[in-house]
Regions:
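Thiol-based oxidoreductase modules, predominantly thioredoxin-like and allied folds used
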Residues: 41-44, 86-105
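A short beta-strand-turn-helix
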Residues: 43-59
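A short glycine-leucine-enriched loop at secondary-structure breakpoints
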Residues: 110-114
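Short active-site neighborhood of thiol/selenol oxidoreductases, capturing the structured segment around
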Residues: 57-70
Length: 157
């Protein structure tokens, strides 16, 4: 093989690798993922489709802000989002949306979220009901979740 053929082959190989890397990155971007499973719970991976679903079902929304590198997020997901009692309540009462604050920085900043984990509850008309900044053990999260449910009942009367 001549030196020119070697250079051309190397350039073609590099081009293929660059295109493959771009395609792989785009296939894993939140814009191409409709759902993400955290713990034992499935969430919409974007605000817009989750909000549309909440409007269609006339349900309140639970938005969970996280990042893949956040230790306290992983701990919350392993404990609270894997607990059957908690996940049953969340799935029955809310449309669930998860926002990766690194990949979806604007969504987080627009809602004044600057740390993870962070949770916001909205009623079915889109009014903010409660915020939970930071990690909560599952028992404390369950107490807070029940408080939110009570506030939702009162606001519907």
């Amino acid at each position: 093989m001549s030196p020119l053929h070697k250079v051309i082959s190397l350039l073609v190989l590099c081009s293929i690798l660059v295109v493959a890397a771009i395609l792989w990155e785009n296939s894993n971007s939140p814009a191409n993922m409709e759902f993400i499973t955290l713990g034992k719970t499935s969430f919409y991976a974007q605000l817009e489709p989750g909000i549309k679903e909440a409007v269609n079902q006339s349900k309140p929304i639970f938005v969970y802000f996280r990042s893949e590198t956040c230790y306290w997020c992983m701990k919350f997901e392993e404990e609270a989002l894997s607990d059957k009692g908690i996940t049953d309540i969340l799935n029955k009462e809310f449309v669930l949306i998860s926002i990766d604050t690194i990949k979806q920085k604007n969504a987080a900043l627009n809602l004044n979220v600057r740390s993870t984990p962070y949770m916001i509850f909205f009623n079915k008309t889109g009014e903010e009901i409660s915020r939970i900044p930071g990690y909560l053990p599952k028992d404390e999260f369950l107490v807070k979740l029940n408080e939110v449910l009570e506030r939702l009942k009162v606001s519907q009367v």
